[in-house]
Amino acid sequence: MNLLFHFLFFVGSLFNNTNGYKPGDVATDFSLKSVDGKMVSMSDYKNAKGFVVVFTCNSCPFAVKYEDRLNAFAKNYTSKGYILIAINPNDASVKPEDSFEKMQVRAKEKQFTFPYVYDEKQTIYPQYGATKTPHIFLLDKNRVVKYIGAMDDNADDAEMVKERYLENAIEALEKGIEPTPATTKAIGCSIKAKKLG
């Protein structure tokens, strides 16, 4: 009976973790293969002031609309100590356009100025609780989650953006205060999980 209780508690804890991180949680590091063939971890960046982990892909129209914005962000903020790491969480057997080889092509075409890595085993995105591409997680230098959601308030048109959620959250961190809002709704395509069986 005691064994059954422990088993049910363990199973229950698995389900409780499916929601992923919330602001204030500490995110675990990862080691994922980048399009240049190197393994990338947050621990590689010893002097980082924070990290922007964005789950994105090649195939989603919303993700494509944010590529130039992510490039511009990386150019502006990497020198300020905020490291952007883009993670493709999609399974290539479901979305062939999101294969590692196609990621390499896309990164070269768009001249990405940030690491673009592949969550091939699909172990990282569930930990974070990412559900869309794109889906952004801002972490401080200690990997404490500070903001989750959309980059800004206009997925369709960068010229019409009124609220820059991610940049505002970083400004809050720079001032030593908590970002408000700490969460927004991520707008994008659902992440394509590997089909079982």
Which residue stretches match the model-derived regions?
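Loop/turn elements at helix/coil->beta-strand transitions in domains of secreted/extracellular proteins
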Residues: 48-51, 79-84, 111-115, 141-142
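N-terminal "domain-start" segment that seeds a small globular fold
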Residues: 14-43
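Structural microenvironment flanking redox-active thiols in thiol-disulfide oxidoreductases
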Residues: 64-109, 120-127
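Bacterial Sec-dependent N-terminal signal peptides
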Residues: 1-20
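Short active-site neighborhood of thiol/selenol oxidoreductases, capturing the structured segment around
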Residues: 41-64, 84, 170
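Short, internal strand/loop/helix patches
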Residues: 103-140, 146
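Thiol-/selenol-based redox modules, centered on thioredoxin-like
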Residues: 138-197
